[in-house]
A protein has these predicted regions:
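Short, well-ordered beta-strand elements
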Residues: 186-190, 195-207, 211-219, 224, ...
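Short helix-loop capping/hinge segments that flank enzyme active sites or metal/cofactor-binding pockets
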Residues: 13-28, 68-125, 163-165, 171-199
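Short connector loops at secondary-structure junctions
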Residues: 51-69, 102
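Short glycine-rich anion-binding loops that position phosphate/pyrophosphate groups of nucleotides
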Residues: 143-144
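Short hydrophobic alpha-helices that are characteristic scaffold elements of the AMP-binding
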Residues: 152-154
């Protein structure tokens, strides 16, 4: 009741529901540059589950700019760290670390905030339009291949991320919030480890059940849900 941005809504999910009457969409560009072999094989797998799978398009908007809202909200939530100087005690102090992100956010102008709120509204309309014709959207998690991770963080659409396979990668570098974008860390050189790679499923507002039903069917098809990285990974 104290959170004016939330809605009390029932959670509806029946594990026995079939997905054969559902429409699953995907953004073709998200499965091109930047997509992995696992991403592409997962798209192929979902086409074999009996549901209708269609290509869809998301309106062309500067979705990554929404990250600036995150900067401002985080800076406001942790303002006491910045004003007290306690942010200096945090271990990580690079450009992309949270302490410097809190500091940089204070240079966003009132005009910036108005424009970002307008962009957020356009994003809400764009994603709502997307889900008028589909029940679930499948796509890579990373922000490189597609915009859905960032876009739905500002619309509230539910997302399920499941293990889709494994790949051999060296340890990743630190995640970064510098340059006005989210970077989840790049794999470096050196010893490689067998690590899980996931795929994301998004659904319409208050329709988590459909997302979970598709996730269950996809997990069964991929048959990697029981596997774990080795202990030295």
């Amino acid at each position: 009741k104290e959170d004016m941005g939330s809605i009390e809504a029932p959670f509806k999910f029946d594990t026995k529901n079939s997905i054969k009457d559902l429409v699953i969409g995907y953004l073709p560009d998200a499965f091109k540059n930047g997509a992995t072999k696992i991403d592409k094989s997962t798209l192929k797998a979902i086409k074999s589950l009996g549901a209708k799978v269609v290509k869809v398009q998301l309106e062309d908007l500067p979705y990554m700019s929404l990250i600036n809202i995150l900067y401002a909200e985080a800076a406001a939530a942790f303002e006491h760290l910045t004003l007290s100087g306690k942010d200096d005690t945090l271990t990580w102090q690079d450009d992309g670390a949270w302490p410097n992100t809190f500091r940089k956010a204070r240079f966003l102008s009132a005009v910036d905030h108005v424009q970002l709120d307008r962009l957020r509204y356009l994003t809400m309309k764009s994603v709502a339009k997307l889900f008028k014709d589909i029940d679930v959207l499948i796509g890579p998690f990373d922000t490189g291949p597609g915009p859905m991770l960032v876009a739905t963080n500002f619309t509230g659409h539910p997302c399920l991320h499941i293990r889709a396979g494994f790949e051999q990668l060296a340890s990743r570098g630190a995640a970064s919030l510098s340059d006005g974008k989210l970077n989840t860390g790049e794999a470096g050189e050196g010893k490689k480890f067998r690590v899980p790679h996931g795929i994301s499923l998004w659904g319409n507002l208050f329709e988590e059940g459909k997302v979970l039903n598709v996730g269950m069917a996809l997990e069964k098809k991929l048959n990697v849900w029981k596997e774990r990285p080795s202990i030295d990974s």
